[in-house]
Amino acid sequence: MNSDLSNAAAGQRDDRDFVLAAVKTSGVAIRSASERLRADPDVALQAVRQNGRALEFVADQCRGDRKIVQAAVGKWAIALQFASPDLRDDRDIVLRAVRKWGVAVKYASERLRADREIVLIAVKRNSAALKYASDELRAELQAGHPSIRQLGTGAVTLSRDDNEG
């Protein structure tokens, strides 16, 4: 089966079984599914389980579904950027993302970018994450920790996971 729904007939793009089969092979195929199916939580969940980037293409209400966002972030930490504002302020979801890719902290809410534990985990995973901490926390961390002061200067070589999560 061709998992690219862009060439599928309109009826197939709205056929739940057809679309489910497609997104199990290629999660981002959901981008060409009907609006109704992009809003279907089961279809969205299958898509993000296959490819976290699929969160970009699901309906807004699915971006606010905790289970869907957790699955997406578990596959691809950068998917956090497509989560609803409420879920970008969800400590557990943000922790899951930054443990996978530290720089994902840049997509967290302002409140969580000021959370010491989250920022320290992010910086341990990837030194580039420090620049996304709140100004106050970044200054505090740089003043209190010699190694973090060094991180803030950009003098540290970035880890290989700086590319993506």
Predicted regions and their residues:
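Non-catalytic tandem-repeat scaffold regions and their flanking low-complexity/translocation tails
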Residues: 1-165
